C-alpha cells in the first residue's frame, strides 16, 4: 500500500479501503526475488533473476516507475568489495555495448533529452547531454566513498550551508535524497560514485552488520542526473546476528524459516 501509517481510509467494517489506494484495489506484486534467489545461489554458486518489479510509491517523477524490469545477481561467498566490482563491471559493459551498437537510438533519445532540458529552469538543467552522461559513466572509474565520509562532505557543502537543499543534512544517519546523491556525483567528485557502509537502521535486515554495530555492508551506485541506479549488499551469514536483526525489526521468524535455514545448512 502507498498509504501512510495510521492514515489509511477504512470501509464500514473497519478494513482498509484499497479502492482509494495507488492501484485502486488490493494488490500483491513482486518487489524482489532476492531472498528466493539466495536459495539457488547456495546450490549453484552464481545466479541471477530478471523480470518485472513493482513499487507502490506514489512518486510522480521521471525517476520512479510503478513497474520496471530489474536484474538481481546473487553470488555465494562474495563480500562487499566483490559486490561493488561486479556492479561497476556490469554497468560499464552494458553502456559500452549500447554506445557502440545503438547509436541511432541514442541520437534520437539525446535530441529528445536536450529538448526537455530546455523547458526546465536554468538551475535544474543538466550540465551534460544524454550521450555525455553515458560516456561519462562508461569511461570513468567509480569513486568509492563511505556513507560517513559522504555525510561529512554534504554537511560542509555550500548548498547545505546556504540551505539550498530541500532536505538539509544536519546529522549522521540521514537517509540521502536524490539531490544529495547528484551533488556528490556531479559537483564534488565529478565521476560515478559508490557509497557503502550505510546506517543499519535505514537498510534491510539481511545486510551484514559491521563490527561497529551501527553500519551494514550495503552499497549504492550513483549516476549523474539520476542518483541511485544500483543497490546491493553483502548478506548477513551469521545465524544469531540475523535472528536478532529480525527481532529488532519485528519480522516474523516463522514466515522466513526457510531463509534462516540457509544459515544453518547453506
Predicted regions and their residues:
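Class II aminoacyl-tRNA synthetase-like tRNA-binding/catalytic domains
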Residues: 1-76
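Hydrophobic (often cysteine-bearing) scaffold residues that line and stabilize catalytic clefts
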Residues: 83-87, 146, 238
Amino acid at each position: 500500500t502507498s498509504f501512510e501509517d495510521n492514515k489509511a481510509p477504512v470501509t464500514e467494517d473497519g478494513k482498509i479501503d484499497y479502492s482509494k489506494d495507488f492501484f485502486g484495489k488490493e494488490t500483491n506484486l513482486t518487489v524482489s526475488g532476492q531472498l528466493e534467489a539466495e536459495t539457488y545461489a547456495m546450490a549453484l554458486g552464481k545466479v541471477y533473476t530478471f523480470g518485472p518489479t513493482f513499487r507502490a510509491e506514489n512518486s510522480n517523477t521521471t525517476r520512479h516507475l510503478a513497474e520496471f524490469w530489474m536484474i538481481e545477481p546473487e553470488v555465494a561467498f562474495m563480500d562487499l568489495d566483490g559486490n561493488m566490482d561486479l556492479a561497476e563491471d556490469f554497468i560499464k559493459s552494458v553502456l559500452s555495448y549500447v554506445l557502440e551498437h545503438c547509436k541511432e537510438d541514442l541520437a534520437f533519445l539525446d535530441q529528445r533529452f536536450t529538448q526537455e532540458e530546455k523547458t526546465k529552469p536554468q538551475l535544474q538543467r543538466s550540465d551534460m547531454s544524454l550521450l555525455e552522461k553515458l560516456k561519462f559513466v562508461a569511461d570513468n572509474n567509480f569513486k568509492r566513498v563511505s556513507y560517513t565520509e559522504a555525510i561529512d562532505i554534504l554537511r560542509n557543502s555550500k548548498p547545505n550551508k546556504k540551505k539550498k537543499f530541500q532536505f538539509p543534512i544536519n546529522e549522521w544517519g540521514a537517509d540521502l535524497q536524490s539531490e544529495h546523491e547528484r551533488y556528490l556525483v556531479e559537483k564534488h567528485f565529478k565521476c560515478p560514485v559508490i557509497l557503502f557502509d550505510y546506517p543499519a537502521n535505514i537498510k534491510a535486515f539481511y545486510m551484514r552488520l559491521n563490527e561497529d554495530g551501527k553500519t551494514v555492508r550495503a552499497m549504492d551506485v550513483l549516476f549523474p542526473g539520476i542518483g541511485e541506479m544500483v543497490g546491493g549488499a553483502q548478506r548477513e551469514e551469521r545465524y544469531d546476528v540475523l535472528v536478532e536483526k529480525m527481532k529488532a525489526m519485528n519480522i516474523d521468524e516463522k514466515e522466513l524459516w526457510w531463509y534462516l535455514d540457509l544459515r544453518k545448512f547453506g
